[in-house]
From Swiss-Prot:
May control the interaction of photosystem II (PSII) cores with the light-harvesting antenna, regulates electron flow through the 2 photosystem reaction centers. PSII is a light-driven water plastoquinone oxidoreductase, using light energy to abstract electrons from H(2)O, generating a proton gradient subsequently used for ATP formation. It comes from Phalaenopsis aphrodite subsp. formosana. The keyword Thylakoid applies. HAMAP family: PSII_PsbZ (MF_00644). PSII is composed of 1 copy each of membrane proteins PsbA, PsbB, PsbC, PsbD, PsbE, PsbF, PsbH, PsbI, PsbJ, PsbK, PsbL, PsbM, PsbT, PsbY, PsbZ, Psb30/Ycf12, at least 3 peripheral proteins of the oxygen-evolving complex and a large number of cofactors. It forms dimeric complexes. Pfam families: Ycf9. This is Photosystem II reaction center protein Z. Gene3D superfamilies: Photosystem II PsbZ, reaction centre. Coiled coil: none annotated.
Length: 62
């Protein structure tokens, strides 16, 4: 169970870093928002799901 928690935390951190870099780049590009809107929303949904997964796994471990 601890390994699953650690992998979920790592995935959350990696997703956060990817979104931290990619979202400003998408907004700064000329037509990036209209063509990459679905990717940004998918990444945000993944991030929210990982937050809940980490919270659930944390409650099971401690």
């Amino acid at each position: 169970m601890t390994i699953a928690f650690q992998l979920a935390v790592f995935a959350l951190i990696a997703t956060s870093l990817i979104l931290l870099i990619s979202v400003p780049v998408v907004f700064a590009s000329s037509d990036g928002w209209s063509s990459n809107k679905n990717i940004v929303f998918s990444g945000t949904s993944l991030w929210i799901g990982l937050v809940f997964l980490v919270a659930i796994l944390n409650s099971l471990i401690s």
